[in-house]
């Protein structure tokens, strides 16, 4: 898999088209990363939006056409971008309570369930997750894991 940078508008539209409960107006100002397979086909995308400069927080949304788009190295590249390049201290994501696949992915990536917001998506509730920079740094996909692997062979 290959990460694609510099295609934020196009990639944000690609992701938005695959999220059935997405606001039709889109993400607003954002940065996006595409994920291409070995043949160069887009198989997934991640959009960082809702940037709060004062509190250094950002929201993340993602979509995929393949269940195999998240390799360990792809995950590291995607998660390092907001924390290392944008300098955020908190990344959040909101999805529907019945979106078990997304909830499972968020939890596997180290995000913490924060609660349920009522009628976040019009008539549907939303469940909130977050990942803090320190949690990412020490987690399965953070730099502490890479440093440990490099120092142990």
Tell where the protein language model's regions lie, with residue ranges.
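Acetyl-CoA-dependent GNAT
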Residues: 6-55
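Conserved GNAT acetyl-CoA-binding A-motif
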Residues: 84-95
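Conserved N-terminal entry element of GNAT/NAT acetyltransferase domains
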Residues: 1-10, 135-153
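Conserved acetyl-CoA binding element of GNAT-fold acetyltransferases
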Residues: 54-66, 94
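Conserved catalytic-core motifs of GNAT/GCN5-like acyltransferases
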Residues: 112-127
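Conserved glycine-rich acetyl-CoA-binding loop
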Residues: 65-76
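Conserved beta-strand-loop-alpha-helix junction that forms the acyl-donor binding cleft
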Residues: 93-103, 120-121
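Conserved active-site alpha-helix within GNAT-family acetyltransferase domains
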Residues: 98-115
């Amino acid at each position: 898999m290959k990460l694609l940078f510099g295609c934020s508008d196009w990639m944000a539209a690609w992701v938005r088209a695959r999220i059935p409960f997405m606001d039709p107006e889109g993400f607003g100002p954002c940065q996006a990363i595409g994920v291409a397979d070995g043949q160069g086909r887009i198989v997934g995308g991640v959009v960082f939006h809702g940037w709060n400069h004062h509190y250094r927080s950002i929201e993340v949304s993602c979509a995929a056409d393949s269940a195999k788009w998240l390799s360990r190295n792809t995950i590291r590249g995607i998660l390092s971008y907001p924390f290392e390049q944008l300098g955020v201290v908190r990344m959040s994501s909101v999805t529907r309570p019945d979106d078990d696949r997304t909830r499972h992915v968020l939890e596997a990536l180290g995000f913490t369930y924060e609660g349920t917001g009522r009628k976040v998506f019009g008539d549907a509730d939303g469940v909130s997750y977050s990942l803090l920079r320190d949690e990412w740094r020490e987690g399965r996909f953070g730099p502490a894991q890479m440093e440990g692997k490099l120092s142990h062979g």
